[in-house]
Amino acid sequence: MSMPATSTKTTKLATSLIDEYALLGWRAMLTEVNLSPKPGLVDRINCGAHKDMALEDFHRSALAIQGWLPRFIEFGACSAEMAPEAVLNGLRPIGMACEGDMFRATAGVNTHKGSIFSLGLLCAAIGRLLQLNQSVTPITICATAASFCRGLTDRELRTNNSQLTAGQRLYQQLGLTGARGEAEAGYPLVINHALPHYLTLLDQGLDPELALLDTLLLLMATNGDTNVASRGGEGGLRWLQREAQTLLNNGGIRTPADLDYLRQFDRECIERNISPGGSADLLILTWFLAQI
């Protein structure tokens, strides 16, 4: 793979450190997809609301993406002297090349396009922070990623083109900003909600898988998931948020017996053809940042 982007200076980061963060990104993707049972999502039990996807597609995709994560980190480091708003344009060709490898690995199935965007941003942010000898924490990573995306929502969603993209249509109809808005805001759903929730459950001694499933419910209840809205409309999104919040209000996922509630939720999502893919992407970031 050749580096399809220019940069302003060479990186001084150790290859071992870069590979360590890339490995965490790969593990985050695998941890999310293997987590079971997940309502409407591909997992070890079934394909959720995705008739065109299988667990193995996600495994192959994650491996293909792992090879590109060091490139995002390296570009973040090499562009550390650039204005943060200028970094995103340099990341785009890396992301597109990574996306191409994902599609080749899955024979054309879109498994992790959202994760390429979000993990790519976070990896570039890590590279920039390391290069500048600044503290690498979940908060500084997300704040740096946000600085890369300044103005992104205005540029890409608030347009009046005659042919709207799916994201533009959902923004104009429902006010949903999706992955762009969450990134530009510094991932507040992760930093302020999902990550502290997950870490608190772990501190309380809850099984890590149960803690992650409960955190997924929290994200589903609070996230304006454009994946859900594109499949189920505003009604489908409100239904999903309401059902997830009801499960949380009733105690959440604390014991293996509680998994029966998730299995029933999964069946209902499949019947409605609803998949909370945006929340799954944020869960990947939550696990990733929890390791840092």
Curated annotation (Swiss-Prot):
The keyword Secreted does not apply. Keywords: ATP-binding, Nucleotide-binding, Transferase. It comes from the Bacteria. It catalyses: 3'-dephospho-CoA + ATP = 2'-(5''-triphospho-alpha-D-ribosyl)-3'-dephospho-CoA + adenine. It holds the Pfam family CitG. The keyword Ubl conjugation does not apply. InterPro entries: CitG, TriPribosyl-deP-CoA_syn_CitG. GO terms for molecular function: ATP binding; triphosphoribosyl-dephospho-CoA synthase activity. GO terms for biological process: prosthetic group biosynthetic process. Its EC number is 2.4.2.52. Belongs to the CitG/MdcB family. NCBIfam families: citrate_citG, PRK10096.1. Catalyzes the formation of 2-(5''-triphosphoribosyl)-3'-dephosphocoenzyme-A, the precursor of the prosthetic group of the holo-acyl carrier protein (gamma chain) of citrate lyase, from ATP and dephospho-CoA. This is 2-(5''-triphosphoribosyl)-3'-dephosphocoenzyme-A synthase. The lineage of its organism: Bacteria, Pseudomonadati, Pseudomonadota, Gammaproteobacteria, Enterobacterales. The gene is citG.
